From Swiss-Prot:
The gene is csrA. It comes from Aeromonas hydrophila subsp. hydrophila (strain ATCC 7966 / DSM 30187 / BCRC 13018 / CCUG 14551 / JCM 1027 / KCTC 2358 / NCIMB 9240 / NCTC 8049). Coiled coil: none annotated. The keyword RNA-binding applies. Keywords: Activator, Cytoplasm, Repressor, RNA-binding, Translation regulation. This is Translational regulator CsrA. GO terms for biological process: mRNA catabolic process; negative regulation of translational initiation; positive regulation of translational initiation; regulation of carbohydrate metabolic process. The lineage of its organism: Bacteria, Pseudomonadati, Pseudomonadota, Gammaproteobacteria, Aeromonadales. GO terms for molecular function: mRNA 5'-UTR binding.
């Protein structure tokens, strides 16, 4: 796992098209903004896990 330190307003790049910006920090919560192309899915981990659990086995999604 890569661990980075960023301050509010600073951005990191993932590949050429995805940016993650620290928008704010309040207590133990960090607000981040993600800018990615429409074809790149971005979910919180708990939402992604729910989506995966709801997929029907053998369903391709196409």
């Amino acid at each position: 796992m890569l661990i980075l330190t960023r301050r509010v307003g600073e951005t990191l790049m993932i590949g050429d098209e995805v940016t993650v910006t620290v928008l704010g920090v309040k207590g133990n919560q960090v607000r981040i903004g993600v800018n990615a192309p429409k074809e790149v899915s971005v979910h919180r981990e708990e939402i992604y896990q729910r989506i995966q659990a709801e997929k029907v086995p053998g369903q391709s999604g196409f």
